[in-house]
Amino acid sequence: MKLSMPRFDQAPVLVVGDVMLDRYWHGGTSRISPEAPVPVVKVDQIEDRPGGAANVALNIAALGAPAALIGVTGQDEAADSLANSLQAAGVRSVFQRIAHQPTIVKLRVMSRHQQLLRIDFEEPFATDPLSLGAEVESLLEGVKVLVLSDYGKGALKNHQSLIQAARAKGIPVLADPKGKDFSIYRGASLITPNLSEFETIVGRCADEAELVAKGLQLLLDLDLGALLVTRGEHGMTLLRTGQPALHLPARAREVFDVTGAGDTVISTLAAAIAAGEDLPHAVGLANLAAGIVVGKLGTAAISAPELRRAIQREEGSERGVLGLEQLLLAIDDARAHNEKIVFTNGCFDILHAGHVTYLEQARAQGDRLIVAVNDDASVSRLKGPGRPINSVDRRMAVLAGLGAVDWVISFPEGTPENLLSQVKPDVLVKGGDYGIDQVVGADIVKGYGGTVKVLGLVENSSTTAIVEKIRKN
């Protein structure tokens, strides 16, 4: 399955469900309490993050999609913190604030990137919450997908009225289910239980074949459009009536924290479907997004650039010819892994042994080598009529095939100052007998603390000489 980045900016989504605040107390631990055999944490940072349905909305907004949220909170500072965080992220939130009942808060005590303790502040909402019919109707008018984010905390008690209202308007409904009765999600377009939640409903599955059979039966029983079972390290399984099962392997490189991974899955699915992607492609994107978010600590969202970079890696564009946006994402990813970026540029009209040796030496100055290539018009201006011999596409393709070269990009100007200002390499390399101050762009690179190096050229290796020899013969 070939993945591509959707137009999330044209994909409005409404989330309705159980909102909560994820609060983190960070601190150091250096001793055991004299009162009990437990560590003493000296708290030096308090951090609030939207959780539950609020995290789903936050993830949707982080991808660049317009997000709206309806939920239930108390009338307290936790609700204010949630509202402020969501507003800062661009999420439109409508809260039903209930007096004398606390906003749900999950407090985690953290030390050295480890969770030592979780404390929950919550009381299930016993009243008939979400009596926000007018607000729901109003917000449904402008969205392309409705998400029901159900954590079983009492905010969602009218599943069917929401599902039917959305279906009447032709709006797909995605539900992240909870509890022992999935009939409340009857008629949904897609539900996304994890394996444990799924087996609570259908019974234990001995193998994949049994999972598929029981899942297909559940689709029929509940009139569901599709079922996506998330299976942790075993990936995901998508089931649709009349279609073969689609199994996707897990994509995580490293797993630090699975908190909120399900939120990331349904938010990416919702945004992708709202953007017009078909379900298999949306599931592929959600699987990729989940692999990113479990590599983060705590409840977290992934951004559009992070997802775009993961798609590039998945589709094999980790190396080769890139556009500027792709290149900047690739550089961000490399720097996140403490890799040094080297930059060189030239026409590279007829690639010869001198070029190859020079590029190998340039690559040795760091971890990643960018080769910026003059486009055809700029080569003609620099070298005169009849040049280039090879088009820019062919020149870049040959350069991209060299083991020393990571990324190749073209530029239209005669010199690469504009590109250097955006790329900001750690090392600028040029071949020849220049002084460092004579290297074009040296002032830019040195201005932000980068390094400029001049490498000697291989003798008797010149594109111009090769061209003249060909012409004479």
Curated annotation (Swiss-Prot):
GO cellular component, one term: cytosol
TM spans (from-to): none
EC number(s) per entry: 2.7.1.167, 2.7.7.70
Gene Ontology molecular functions: ATP binding; heptose 7-phosphate kinase activity; heptose-1-phosphate adenylyltransferase activity; phosphotransferase activity, alcohol group as acceptor
GO biological process entries: ADP-L-glycero-beta-D-manno-heptose biosynthetic process
UniProt region (Ribokinase), positions on chain: 1-317
Associated pathway: Nucleotide-sugar biosynthesis; ADP-L-glycero-beta-D-manno-heptose biosynthesis; ADP-L-glycero-beta-D-manno-heptose from D-glycero-beta-D-manno-heptose 7-phosphate: step 1/4; Nucleotide-sugar biosynthesis; ADP-L-glycero-beta-D-manno-heptose biosynthesis; ADP-L-glycero-beta-D-manno-heptose from D-glycero-beta-D-manno-heptose 7-phosphate: step 3/4
Enzyme class, spelled out: transferase
InterPro entries on file: Bifunc_HldE, Carboh/pur_kinase_PfkB_CS, Cyt_trans-like, PfkB_dom, RfaE_dom_I, RfaE_dom_II, Ribokinase-like, Rossmann-like_a/b/a_fold
Stretches the record annotates as Cytidylyltransferase: 343-473
Binding locations of ATP: 194-197
Catalytic residues of the enzyme: 263
PROSITE patterns on file: PFKB_KINASES_1
Classification via Gene3D superfamilies: 3.40.1190.20, HUPs
One Pfam family it belongs to: PfkB
Catalytic activity of the protein: D-glycero-beta-D-manno-heptose 7-phosphate + ATP = D-glycero-beta-D-manno-heptose 1,7-bisphosphate + ADP + H(+); D-glycero-beta-D-manno-heptose 1-phosphate + ATP + H(+) = ADP-D-glycero-beta-D-manno-heptose + diphosphate
Keywords: ATP-binding, Carbohydrate metabolism, Kinase, Multifunctional enzyme, Nucleotide-binding, Nucleotidyltransferase, Transferase
Cited function: Catalyzes the ADP transfer from ATP to D-glycero-beta-D-manno-heptose 1-phosphate, yielding ADP-D-glycero-beta-D-manno-heptose.
Family per similarity comment: In the N-terminal section; belongs to the carbohydrate kinase PfkB family.
Subunit field text: Homodimer.
Full protein name: Bifunctional protein HldE
Lineage of producing organism: Bacteria, Pseudomonadati, Pseudomonadota, Gammaproteobacteria, Pseudomonadales
Gene that this sequence comes from: hldE
